[in-house]
Amino acid sequence: MEAIVQAPTPEGVGIVRTQRMHWTTPLTLTSGATLGPITLAYETYGELAPDRSNAILILHALSGDAHAAGFHSPTDRKPGWWDAMIGPGRPFDTNRYFVICSNVIGGCRGSTGPSSPHPSDGRPYGSRFPLITIEDMVHAQQRLIDALGIDTLLAVAGGSMGGFQALAWTVEYPQRVRGAILLATSARSSPQTVAWNYIGRRAIMADPRWRGGDYYDSDAPRDGLAVARMLGHITYLCEEKLEQRFGRRVDGDALDLGPRFAIEHYLEHQAARFNDRFDANSYLVITRAMDNWDLTARYGSLTAAFDLTRARFLALAYSSDWLYPPAETYQMAAAAQAAGRSFTTHLITTDAGHDAFLTDVAAQSELIRDFLNRLMTE
């Protein structure tokens, strides 16, 4: 296969811009409802090979977006959410691969979601936005891949909800995906995960400022979204990391009901940051899509689902991940192997919890690099 080779640039992909693709033709959703027109925000890194064989689609988790790598301006304080993994010489090597990342439908970072204008009146969808599924997200992404002129993806890759999408790609479009990289993910949302998500949604809907989802002309339900984010953020860590990072350090009056412990201040900080960049209705819509994710229920058995796939799989599990624990990765491996599929699993020992797929770069880099190398040389 032919790939573009460029001179190395150790500083990463540099300054990038978010692009948008628009479609006037409505998307028919799993529910039978339609959504349209549709906009997808996306970014690309590297160059597409002349034979279009080197494209990799990166799929983000709940709070992610299209900005996976690089900076939007020289004054940006932080790069994209997976910058350490994408760039020249990095696992998703932009000297070799054409890397794409898009914001999911239902989101609030440039793609069509509840805060987008409704085509009938130009006002935000709000409560009128339809419920979507992980498969709906993938069907929208398929339009983007078509528009970019790509027939077959070298790989799809994602962690957490991004892993849901990667799996869905291999089932929905088996002839268009050669490899799938699954990190800290599962073939279904467990009852525990559904419970955490429900409590978060309940907090948002109990905020008087939610107003049934139609709050865009007034104050947003910041208190409810803050509680949802705090709860969710705890599930991304683990007890060992919390003890190591915060212990029982205090900064405040023991008789005050406000934040006193270091962990409380940390959660308040995370909630405030999240409120500044995320929409409460998007949180509701996306977490419900996550709850409904279940390949076994959709296809009768997990083995039957994998029987539909043609891709090679690399799955990374993380020892301290209690949101999508390693046992769920092993269940996928058993089902895939029963279906005769190539499914390689690695357990990474870490104290970073579920967030390890974002932070434990060194531990996972060579595994991903080697997997992609094999795909390119087959």
Swiss-Prot record:
Active site feature: 160 (nucleophile), 321, 354
Catalyzed chemical reaction(s): L-homoserine + acetyl-CoA = O-acetyl-L-homoserine + CoA
Annotated pathway: Amino-acid biosynthesis; L-methionine biosynthesis via de novo pathway; O-acetyl-L-homoserine from L-homoserine: step 1/1
Listed InterPro entries: AB_hydrolase_1 (IPR000073), AB_hydrolase_fold (IPR029058), HAT_MetX-like (IPR008220)
Domain AB hydrolase-1: 54-359
Primary subcellular site in the record, as a coarse category: cytoplasm
Enzyme Commission number(s) of this protein: 2.3.1.31
Gene Ontology terms, MF aspect: homoserine O-acetyltransferase activity
Subcellular location: Cytoplasm
Annotated GO biological process: methionine biosynthetic process
Signal peptide region: none
Binding site for substrate: 229, 355
Record flagged with keyword Phosphoprotein: no
Keywords: Acyltransferase, Amino-acid biosynthesis, Cytoplasm, Methionine biosynthesis, Transferase
GO CC annotation terms, alphabetical: cytoplasm
Biological function: Transfers an acetyl group from acetyl-CoA to L-homoserine, forming acetyl-L-homoserine.
Oligomer status and interactors: Homodimer.
PANTHER family: HOMOSERINE O-ACETYLTRANSFERASE
Family: Belongs to the AB hydrolase superfamily. MetX family.
Protein name per UniProt: Homoserine O-acetyltransferase
Gene symbol of the encoding locus: metXA
